[in-house]
């Protein structure tokens, strides 16, 4: 099972680039550490555009899972909450529609720029870890494993 590498796609928002480009670097590095292959990196203007890119990647046969990366920084209005909540809902729906894992590596809502900088490593690596683990476990279940406690 683990001989066959998990192939993942990464969707990263360019908005708040000082944060998201570091998230992308950490995510790619962690994927290599987990022996997962990054097949595609799809850069989108902002977090709002992430679901469409996720849908495109999930439709590909060479993608087992998708990692989303972004930073939704708190502003003067509730715009950050609306964006983050809608994106989370849509990527979750896409995961169910395509029966492939999609992890949420989006910092926010409500995060300050300083908080987002502090969370780069955690959010990036956890998102990759989650997607790869789920893809491996789903692959094992599809191959006939009777255990739900698959490592």
From Swiss-Prot:
Top-rank taxon: Archaea
Q: What is its EC number?
A: 2.5.1.78
What InterPro entries does this protein map onto?
LS, LS/RS, LS/RS_sf
Query: Which top-level enzyme class is recorded in the Swiss-Prot or TrEMBL entry?
Result: transferase
Which Pfam family name is an example for this entry? Answer: DMRL_synthase
Q: Does the keyword Disulfide bond apply?
A: no
One GO cellular component term noted in the UniProt record for this chain: riboflavin synthase complex
Q: Where does (2S)-2-hydroxy-3-oxobutyl phosphate bind?
A: 76-77, 119
Where's the active site on this chain? 79 (proton donor)
The molecule here is called 6,7-dimethyl-8-ribityllumazine synthase
According to its UniProt entry, this protein's organism is Metallosphaera sedula (strain ATCC 51363 / DSM 5348 / JCM 9185 / NBRC 15509 / TH2)
* Chain's gene name: ribH
